[in-house]
Design a protein with these regions (language model features):
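Structural alpha/beta core scaffold segments of enzyme domains
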Residues: 1-430
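Glycine-rich active-site loop/lid that clamps phosphate-bearing ligands
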Residues: 261, 273, 281-282, 461-482
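Cytochrome P450 core scaffold surrounding the K-helix E-X-X-R motif
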Residues: 434-438
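Short Gly/aromatic-enriched secondary-structure transition segments
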Residues: 440-444
């Protein structure tokens, strides 16, 4: 059974466009800006200018959204602003207007994914052959990282005995594409979930039952030969989905036509690998965090991770406050300044709470048992790969991620076959995210992700003509709104 599935580009449409301010003064280059990864910017400017580390200082300013769009691109305009200030001796500020931001900045990679599945005489899956093509745009950028995650997500949550996968990022004459929430996984899950739905219909089985019967479980092997090391709570998620929706996922209402409109339900399962893909945390990032207890009893968190509207500061402060057993108000966390904070890694890939939060937890335990009240003391903690997480980057064999979150989605949709208008009438989702460090922050992240997913599937369109997007403003670049 074969199928081909495609997705388009998606604009981040963060509320605040890209912007940088650079100042070269007394041999020191300081750059302020809207960014997710201050050390990415610093590490880009160091070879560009040939300066020593102490001559470049990057300060993140309050940032109005990112979603991956302010991961690597800020380094480009930081370089432009920095060069201007270096040459003129005056401060230089570059703020992109909206149409320029849409024109220049990376988008979610468009994709074309083909899946071919072999079944035995009892309709059991024998294997899959998958081809993944993503549109990288004019330069590689983060395409290799996006391609890896798409590759590792390509068989979804399913137990596939044999798989052969070809994955390519193609150079084209469009804007370079880059990171965007999930970076490769949404494209892959759209393909595999649609394919499994169509496959179930082809063999005349209920799609939800077919998906559940083929789902991986605790102890099973992953696509890359790793192991599912934690309980898979799919049955519990399905039970909760039934409770909150009032609908039995295994017996969903059939498609119906009423008043000339089609009403139907869609269902999907997913898992998401947490943190950097493969050996990124171990070999590239090597995150370092510090905690400093001041003489007045306050404790300052020293990390490079940024608050971009996702609630990172609240979450990290809560981790430290609760571990130390002190009031939340005594924990200080300012926007990062590379002259003061260590490189704890980028604010990407759902790693801030899990990786950096855990490092801060361990640092707080150290601090709790050191020094006396009124004494200034600094402790640090560096990331070390757990010995049970084994990965070979050369062969792509082992545990591509240290842990997974799991989820179910159920959507009720109404479509008008004459006007092609689609309305999402209801949406329900259940997610296994472990222990939420802050329930309001976690709920906000889930709500935001759902909204972006619905928008990507329904109203968000980027039309490309000769390498340029026709959509140029927030008026014609439509996204879901309240």
């Amino acid at each position: 059974f074969e199928g081909a599935y495609s997705t388009g580009a998606q604009e981040h449409i963060y509320m605040e466009p890209q912007g940088m301010l650079a100042e070269y003064d007394k041999g020191i280059l300081t750059v302020y800006g809207s960014m997710q990864c201050p050390y990415y910017v610093k590490n880009a400017l160091l070879p560009a200018f040939g300066f020593s580390e102490d001559r470049i200082r990057i300060i993140q300013t309050t940032t109005g959204g990112g979603f991956g769009g302010k991961e690597d691109f800020p380094s480009l305009i930081a370089g432009h602003a920095a060069l201007g200030s270096y040459k003129t001796g005056k401060p230089v500020k570059i703020i992109l207007v909206r149409h320029t931001d849409i024109l220049m900045t990376p988008k979610r990679h468009p994709s074309k994914i083909s899946i071919r599945t072999a079944l035995d005489s009892k309709d059991q899956i024998l294997g899959m052959e998958i081809q993944i093509l993503i549109d990288g745009g004019a330069y590689e950028g983060l395409s290799s990282v996006v391609l890896q995650r798409a590759l590792f997500a390509s068989t979804g949550v399913y137990r596939i005995p044999n798989a052969r996968i070809t994955a390519l990022a193609l150079a084209t004459n469009t804007v370079p594409n880059g990171a965007f929430r999930g970076f490769g996984a949404p494209q892959a899950y759209f393909a595999i979930e649609t394919h499994m739905q169509e496959l179930a219909q082809f063999i005349k089985q209920d799609p939800v039952k077919f998906k559940r019967s083929n789902c991986v479980d605790y102890g099973d092997s992953t696509l890359t030969g790793g192991t599912i090391k934690e309980p898979v709570m799919v049955d519990e998620l399905l039970a909760k989905l039934k409770e909150i929706s009032g609908l039995d996922p295994f017996n969903l209402p059939r498609r119906e036509v009423k008043n000339g409109k089609i009403r139907a339900y869609g269902f999907s399962l997913f898992k998401h690998g947490c943190g950097f893909t493969g050996s990124g945390e171990r070999d590239k990032i090597k995150a370092l965090v510090k905690l400093r207890r001041n003489t007045d009893g306050t404790v300052e968190i020293l990390v490079a991770n940024t608050e971009i509207g996702q609630g990172a500061h609240t979450t990290l402060r809560k981790v430290v406050a609760e571990t130390l057993g002190v009031p939340f108000s005594t924990i200080i966390l300012n926007n990062p300044d590379t002259s003061r904070v260590p490189d704890s890694g980028p604010t990407v890939a759902s790693r801030t709470a899990m990786i950096v939060g855990n490092l801060l937890y361990r640092a707080a335990l150290k601090l709790k048992n050191q020094g006396t009240v009124g004494e200034e003391i600094t402790v640090e903690e560096r990331y070390a790969q757990p010995p049970e997480i084994v990965w070979d980057q050369e062969t792509f064999v082992g545990d591509a991620y240290p842990a997974f979150s799991w989820g179910t989605n159920l959507v009720e949709v109404e479509a008008d076959p004459l006007t092609l208008e689609v309305q999402v009438k209801n949406f329900w989702g259940t997610y296994d995210i472990g222990i939420p460090l802050d329930e309001r922050v976690a709920e906000g992240q889930m709500t935001g992700g759902i909204s972006q997913g619905i928008g990507y599937a329904t109203v968000e369109v980027l039309q490309n003509r000769e390498g340029r997007f026709l959509q140029q403003t927030m008026t014609d670049c439509i996204i879901p709104t309240a």
